[in-house]
A protein has these predicted regions:
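Long, low-hydrophobicity, solvent-exposed regions enriched in small/turn-prone and acidic residues
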Residues: 1-188
Length: 188
């Protein structure tokens, strides 16, 4: 069991802001608390909350249940909550079938709008000298948007020479926490 609370104490008003937002004048940041419970060798329960001590309510919360057989075989189920419309459930998985082949997937479902707003799925092949990855992505900019976007990512890697195609590895690292492209496993 691991519990970690934290908060920043500001001794002066901050002089930096983002865009048109007013400069923050509160003397303290949100109270951040994190907890991790390792259920057994493969299962763990994780929680994170950002608590507003002025308003006495949470700003953002995350709770997840993770199953991890090893670095290349894991499944994560998480629920994210935030002020406003941010209320979603995420399912993500990476599963290595054998030393060369691996599957990956992520789906985000808005529990407030009752619809899937982000899907990523694909397959990856890795050999001694080359690798390739094919991924499909289907998303909405916001869960409430009716407009949908689709993309297909195809990337070839000639080890020691470089990549051809769009850089799907970077997108997948952002989408699936813990994802590392197979071609990067043994880079020097």
């Amino acid at each position: 069991l691991r519990l970690s609370p934290g908060q920043i104490q500001y001794f002066k008003d901050r002089r930096v802001n983002l865009g048109n937002q007013p400069v923050e004048k509160q003397g303290r940041s949100l109270l951040v608390s994190e907890g991790l419970y390792q259920i057994d060798q493969h299962w763990r329960l994780y929680g994170l909350t950002f608590w507003d001590t002025q308003k006495h309510r949470p700003e953002r919360d995350v709770i997840s249940l993770d199953y991890q057989l090893d670095n290349d075989r894991f499944i994560k189920l998480a629920h994210h909550y935030g002020k406003g419309d941010y209320n979603q459930t995420t399912l993500a998985a990476v599963w290595r079938i054998n030393p060369q082949w691996r599957l990956f997937y992520r789906q985000d479902y808005s529990t407030r709008h009752h619809r899937v707003f982000n899907n990523v799925a694909g397959v990856e092949y890795n050999d001694c000298c080359w690798a390739w990855r094919l991924a499909g992505k289907h998303w909405r900019d916001k869960p409430e948007d009716d407009k949908k976007h689709n993309a297909i990512y195809l990337e070839f890697v000639l080890k020691g020479l470089g990549n051809m195609g769009n850089r799907s590895g970077r997108m997948l690292k952002n989408e699936i926490h813990g994802f590392t492209p197979l071609a990067e496993e043994h880079e020097f």
